[in-house]
Regions:
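Short, solvent-exposed loop/hinge segments that bridge or flank secondary-structure elements
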Residues: 22-49
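A structural detector for beta-sheet-dominated domains
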Residues: 26-28, 36-38, 53-57, 66, ...
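N-terminal helix-cap/turn-to-beta initiation motif at the start of protein domains
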Residues: 12-24
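Sec-dependent N-terminal signal peptides
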Residues: 2-12
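Surface-exposed, polar helix/loop patches in the mature regions of secreted/periplasmic/lumenal proteins
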Residues: 73-137
Length: 174
């Protein structure tokens, strides 16, 4: 098989068809890393009614989606599990919290034609064919506490660069 044909085979998205909030993605360069979308209270995140989760060998990270002015692309911003967010009270934050600029990680979403999505994904959208966030790996290595929304029990991890491709449709049973 020549190089171009091999590349085209690699770029073919898996044929998993399900709603965006049930699509499960696997990192092409390390199957131990999976990702997906979950419904989020739209009052907590202006740009999308979906949160993004990343499951690593050690923990699950949660992100809100952000798109500054609609012109700067889509970014992942560390957040908390939207299912637990309702249980979080309005207690004051630690004094040192909020002094650093929020961590924002460029997040690219592609269709099967490799065309980029013009806006952050939302409920009702078809499941993307590819997800890519180049700076997630470096954030897991250099900035893991901020990536875990301030959770100091988080630990440094190594994640290679790669695209996330659909692998399954979550049945919601687990």
């Amino acid at each position: 098989m020549n190089g171009l044909a091999f590349l085209l085979v690699l770029l073919q998205p898996a044929s998993v068809s399900c709603p965006i909030e049930r699509s499960v993605y696997q990192l092409s360069s390390d199957p131990a890393f999976t990702a997906g979308f979950a419904p989020q209270d739209p009052h907590l995140a202006f740009y999308s009614d979906l949160a993004v989760w990343l499951r690593t060998p050690r923990r699950t990270y949660w992100f809100s989606l952000e798109s500054p002015s609609g012109q700067g692309g889509t970014y992942l911003v560390p957040s908390v599990d939207p299912r637990a967010a309702a249980a979080v009270d309005d207690a004051p934050r630690d004094a040192d919290e909020g002094q650093e600029a929020p961590l924002r990680i460029a997040f690219d979403v592609f269709g099967a034609d490799l065309g980029p999505w013009p806006a952050p994904p939302r409920r009702g959208d078809p499941a993307p064919a590819f997800l890519f966030a180049r700076d997630l790996g470096p954030a897991l290595w250099y900035d893991w506490v901020r990536l875990a929304a301030g959770d100091r029990s988080a630990a440094q991890e190594v994640m290679p660069v790669g695209t996330f491709r659909p692998m399954a449709c979550d049945t919601g049973a687990g």
